[in-house]
Amino acid sequence: MTLEEQFLSYLKNERSYSPKTVLAYQKDLAAAKKFWQENGGFPGWDQISRRDLEIYLLATGQKLASSTLSRKLSSLKSFYRLLTRRGLVKADPTVAIQLRRGKKKLPEFFYQDEVGQVIRSLNDGKPLTVRNRAIVALFYATGMRLSELTDLKIKQLDLENGMILVHGKGNKDRYVFFDQESKKYLEEYLQVARPSLLKNEPDTEAVFLNKLGRPISSRGIAKAVQQIFQKAGLTAGAHPHELRHSFATAMLNNGADLRSVQELLGHEDLSTTQIYTHVSMQHLTAEYRQHFPRK
């Protein structure tokens, strides 16, 4: 039996939970697993870290009631308690994770100069470094989801017009745009680094490749981003989600309207985008406090 099946069997046979309750637990585990599969890859329940859980809860919490989010965390805590007790995982990643009551955590983001610092640090000219620079630049310039960037094909790129046709969630297509600086990094990758990486899969249409010349996985991209930011001295926990948050925050801080940002992010519901207005207001408040002459 899989770890999920063992847990569900335990709930049904040892705890005598109703079929409806067992199904609710099953759905909560499936939702978390699906999120990780689409945002970095699912390495197995025994490899999920506290950071993975925090990112999942942050992303999910933007569109759920606090009571629903609490239930999802409770399901994961119960699951990992059983796995830990039976020696099926070495550590419980849910330990010490708590939700703020009645208040959603604001998305973490990087400022423009911080992203610029990271991009400038990727300057040794090696194929993987050139690839990583293009990845970071595109995440920040477009606000794409990790799964969307991972699945990018050459035919989706319009370099001349600085556009990308993105195949988003629910098979919904949209266009995103990139600036001249990002175009420069992308072209350098496509013209110089990508051909040198293209070894075992000469016919692949995937834009971003791993060191073996094969399409890179979401997990590979997430790991690369984390290592890049850690090496640049900014944080040990950077994730592509935070570059997406950074894009949205930068757009709003520079005057973009909420509906436009919603379209660029591919959000179905405007309320999902509205959380970034709180981030922007927080930024504006800090700027006011710092620069207004009367304290």
Curated annotation (Swiss-Prot):
Whether Plastid counts among this entry's keywords is no
Which segments constitute the Core-binding (CB) domain?
A: 1-84
Question: What subcellular compartments does it reside in?
Answer: Cytoplasm
Gene3D superfamilies (UniProt xref)? 1.10.150.130, Intergrase catalytic core
Keywords carried by this UniProt record: Cell cycle, Cell division, Chromosome partition, Cytoplasm, DNA integration, DNA recombination, DNA-binding
Q: Name one Pfam family in it.
A: Phage_integrase
Q: Name one GO biological process term.
A: cell division
Q: What is its main location?
A: cytoplasm
Q: Does the keyword Cytoplasm apply?
A: yes
Please give the function described in this protein's UniProt entry. Site-specific tyrosine recombinase, which acts by catalyzing the cutting and rejoining of the recombining DNA molecules. The XerC-XerD complex is essential to convert dimers of the bacterial chromosome into monomers to permit their segregation at cell division. It also contributes to the segregational stability of plasmids.
Q: Which family does it belong to?
A: Belongs to the 'phage' integrase family. XerC subfamily.
What NCBIfam families does the database record attribute to this sequence?
A: recomb_XerA_Arch, recomb_XerC
Q: How does it assemble?
A: Forms a cyclic heterotetrameric complex composed of two molecules of XerC and two molecules of XerD.
For this entry, the protein name equals Tyrosine recombinase XerC
